[in-house]
Amino acid sequence: MTRLKTKLSALLPFIGLLCAQAQRDMKTINDGWFFRKASTENWQPVNVPHTYNLDAYSQRNYYMGKAFYQKSFVLPEVPQGKRCFLKIDAASKAADLTLNGQKIGSHAGGYSAFTFDITPYIQKNNTIEITVDNSRKDITPISADFTFWGGIYRDVWLITTSEQHFNLLNHGSDGIFISTPHVDEKEATIEIRSEITNDATEKATLEVIHQIYDPQGKLQQTLKQRLSVKAGETQTVRKTSAIGQPQLWSPESPRLYEIVTTLRNPKTGMELDRSTHKTGFRWFSFDGEKGFSLNGKPYKLRGVNRHQDQAPVGVALDDEAHRRDIRLIKEMGCNFIRIAHYPQDDALVEACDEMGLLAWEEIPIINIVPDTPGYDDNCETNLTEMIRQHYNHPSIIAWGYMNEILLTAPGPDRPEWPACRERTVKLAQRLEKTLKQEDPYRASVMAFNMTNLYNEIGLDLVDVSGWNLYHGWYVGQLNDFNRWMEDQHARYPKRPTIISEWGAGSDRRLHSRHPKAFDFSIEYQQTYVEHYLPFIEGTEYISGCTYWNFIDFNVAARQESMPRVNNKGLFYNDRTPKDVSYYFKAMWRKDTPVLHIASRDWPVRTGDKNEKHPVKIYTNLDEVELIINGKSIGKQRPANCHTVFNVTLPYGTSTLKAQGYKNGQMVEDVMVLRLDAMPDLAKGDELAINVGSDCAFTSDVSGLTWLPDQPYSKGSWGYIEGKARSTTSEIENTTDGPLYQTWRENLRAYQIDAPSGTYEVELLMADVSRSRPQLANLLGRGDDGQAIADSRFNITICGRRVETDFSPADGGHYRQAFRRRYIIQNKENKIDVLFETLKGKCHLTGIKIRKL
């Protein structure tokens, strides 16, 4: 790498690096870095955390490749009798490091920390150079339904210790491991395993001291142990003790004990190193019939999956953002989280301990096990790093190591299947063995997708089977979910199960009175969760669930209604809650009243003031009253924490208030909703129609609402003949993609009855007759119509031929939106758009009418 000269003039003084006591000193060195991609020579000043993939928010083919980071700093004096370490909390997905021109090490894996001893290379003036590469195919994951963010996106630490210290080179851990092999209400056993390194040139006699403080900060026990460590060696010592009447940890009462571990010289009393950890005493079990239990009592796991990105910073989040997410998840009523699909920041796991969330953490082995040299070794290293780095966290109850690993594997009818099956099972067996050797006290878990092959080929070797089920979204009907779980339990009644993923996408621009799977309406997502959640809650053998996903998260390869986004979240990417999140809160929060008018995602509607408009309410109250503009509409008793009032609304704004009582105290929620009248062409309104769709679409750019399609009736408007079609492929050259992802095919005409006059008629189209190949895990229900090499048709409006021998593919409009406007004379009190098919199939995706 080219060394920076004039640019790297910023120096970092580490005053206080050498403290009077020889104890550990840790400092972040996140500021003052310079960065460039391999494709450019232009260095840019940056701070870490940093990612070089903000392009993933705007383009499918985001940058995959190498990038370089460089930083210079000065030490006031070279630390004699000290050891210096460089720790990077994460760099994705491979990193090569040099210090002062000398290579100090490499790391393969984008989600775990790694530490190097830089003592031999440190001097007064120092330059760190780090090459990061997010494109490596020999490092897991090789494919996934999330963006492979590149960069140094977590903290960088400079650590100094004495020559005798706890081992910092054990897979990114700090060399201290705390377990609680036995816990009950009367007594708990704690075991502390410490690794001590002597980097001096002489043998050292040392003492390890563990001070155990209870949750109130009172010293409970002091454990001491002497040892002798030869020069240049690392020695492991164990100390076990009993804690009487332990204060148990649970999500409701996350009581944490603090353990301060000190290494000292017993002759001089000098403190050489110190490390502080927190632990909690709890015991748990998974059972195939009775589900999950915590501290001896039945306990339903209620949670979400969590990805770690947030626009506009990608995955380069600060600690406060991680803690905020756990707080939001906890406030929603969760007691459980699946940290998916990779190990996440220490701040997040610490927050789980402190705020009370049980956790499943996993490494990112996803979709398929490739036939790639070194891949299995890399997976095992990833697993070992995750377990050792987060071993001490009481919130973690399960380690996972594969997600939907057969999703893109060849089917059993393919010649490649036997070899793929063998690779997959062999790796699973290897990782299961490693997991149990590393941590015999937690459960192993794997997430299966919707096939029984996992049971048939031996991937059910884990303690708990997780099912990623999307019946009623990607496949089948909602009731198929119930049938699937009932069938699995009948076949394998002793096997513990959890619903590790389930979810439906939603786009706040889309609303439907008749929601259906894959329309991406806010209403279908609500319908979906209102079916799944009561079944999960009411089925004893299901240990619990983690909804997919906590947030709308970035997937550069995703298309659908919101390209670059998986929009199944209960919160938007900016962490604003969707209405549907309050359904979970109403179902799960027993400690506080919940009352929410679920119309924040649909605050502006278009319709007739005499028709009924649904107003949904999520609540855990026994009864709720709805008041509109000061007038009571009535009271209803919710079923499964939701109810719908069908009400008439005046045009303009209305104040809606829902109220009820909990323990004699009034609870209320208030919002303002606006009803706009149906467009009146005679008054100059624009009539915009989302052809081929049952959804209304409101543009977030113009604010214009495109009404759902309907068949023509006299005095109104609508289609004449034709079949509704849809696609999940991205439509380019527009921000209003959903308008072009549904269309009516082979329609004879579209007619709008309107007063005579001059009109502007705008037709929306795209070349939707051909499908763009999608990634295997980007499933969908869009039928894309029938693939037609070329479709040609004539279009006539009010007797005037406006397009002759026309094809949407003309002019390179493949999957690209285009709109054409025509000035038309309406002389017969109707605007009729006639289609004459010459070849293939005609179609229309949208139409807008305006009287001039």
PLM regions with names:
Residues 48-59, 102, 135, 145, ...:
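Extended substrate-binding grooves/exosites of carbohydrate-active enzymes
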Residues 22-89, 140-143, 149-152, 169, ...:
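Extended carbohydrate-recognition surfaces in non-catalytic/accessory domains of CAZymes
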Residues 165-199, 585-620, 679-685:
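Surface beta-strand/loop "capping" patches
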Residues 120-125, 193-287, 644-646, 650-653, ...:
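Extended acidic/polar, glycine-enriched regions
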Residues 36, 64-169, 173-175, 199, ...:
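Accessory beta-strand-rich segments of carbohydrate-active enzymes
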Residues 676-852:
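Compositionally biased, intrinsically disordered or flexible polar/acidic segments
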Residues 21-60, 74, 127, 131, ...:
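Accessory carbohydrate-binding/adhesion or oligomerization-edge regions at the termini
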